[in-house]
Amino acid sequence: MTTALFSPSNRRKRRLTHFFFTVLAFILLAAFIYGHDFISFSRRSLHSPTIVHQSAIVVVVDEPPPPPPTSPPPPSPPPPSPPPPSPPPPSPPPPAFAVGKTPEGCDVFKGNWVKDWSTRPLYRESECPYIQPQLTCRTHGRPDSDYQSWRWRPDSCSLPSFNATVMLESLRGKKMMFVGDSLNRGMYVSLICLLHSQIPENSKSMDTFGSLTVFSLKDYNATIEFYWAPFLLESNSDNATVHRVSDRIVRKGSINKHGRHWRGADIVVFNTYLWWRTGFKMKILEGSFKDEKKRIVEMESEDAYRMALKTMVKWVKKNMDPLKTRVFFATMSPTHYKGEDWGGEQGKNCYNQTTPIQDMNHWPSDCSKTLMKVIGEELDQRAEFPVTVLNITQLSGYRKDAHTSIYKKQWSPLTKEQLANPASYSDCIHWCLPGLQDTWNELFFAKLFYP
């Protein structure tokens, strides 16, 4: 018996039994210690998502993992500051020769005539040897001199005083030209009379070469010139002394024949008007005066005048520098042949008139408002090369007293009938010097130096 109990087989069984009870005891002890957690885990497992174990990787099948915590977005940068305002465009350079500026709203061409013996006349007729005998009224017997005493006073500002020294200094090394008809020649002579007393006798001279008259200022290396071109364009009236042609013909677009004499001028003053007022259509030559068979067409005065101004502006743009030169255009000079225009007797004219017209609304009947409109349209101040308009028309229209009338050199002997009726040969186109045209030059001075 003893042998059987301690046989190797029994000894193995006892060891297995001992091991079994040891494991069982361990399980029971663990169950006691972790029983609560085990129960909680078991309950949780019934509701937990299925987890697949693969090596050391855990994959959640039915729910994505919560996103990783993110940092709060950085604060938005402040809105950019608005760009600084663009600087204003640079002001255009002042016109050539300008030394100042006319006040805003000042129209020197609107005003009235006031008598002023303290400052008028600006020179004496006898002191200026350059006045043509057609304009020396006192020398030719005019009994009154009141026409010399009137000063133009603008309504809203004052007119700068004419300063011969300023004008002469501005002309150093320069060339000034007046281009047009006999009315522009009168303005040219007036300017020379306003300047000549400031120039030494041996340093000035005047010479005429056909259509061109040149006043030389040797100490200033300067010239003031006049060029006869009553239409500005080439015409059959271009002879400076023999131009009384009844059948006037103007060559279309032909400015270069005259224009070659104007090149190099620093200041140009144009005028043209009276010669276009024929009462008929204008004859316009298409081609050359040298053509054996001439093609001539007729145009209304308005259309022909517009053509001339367009051609003038085209020449200016091509030949003048807007930064270094200045161009002016004097509007129409009125005549006074109809006394009824100012409330006078019918059949009377400027003869024996000694005072200006007082009606400030007066407009000279011979001055075409249609042609004035053409001037305004073609000489636009906003153009690439602005032409300064000297609007002398209305202010001159008041001056029925300032014409040469009968007090001038007569080129032909007067008949008995004319002598018996002085009004019949009275010149109501041209103006006595000194007189109205000195005012034109005061206005020219203002616009040249104070634009």
Swiss-Prot record:
Keywords of the record: Golgi apparatus, Membrane, Signal-anchor, Transmembrane, Transmembrane helix
Topology versus the membrane: Single-pass type II membrane protein
Molecular-function GO terms, alphabetical: xylan O-acetyltransferase activity
Phosphoprotein as UniProt keyword: no
Pfam families linked to this entry: PC-Esterase, PMR5N
Annotated stretches, region: Disordered: 62-101
Regions of compositional bias (Pro residues) in chain numbering: 63-96
Chain ranges on the Cytoplasmic side, renumbered to this chain: 1-18
Family affiliation: Belongs to the PC-esterase family. TBL subfamily.
Protein name: Protein trichome birefringence-like 32
Native source species: Arabidopsis thaliana
Taxonomic lineage: Eukaryota, Viridiplantae, Streptophyta, Embryophyta, Tracheophyta
Gene: TBL32
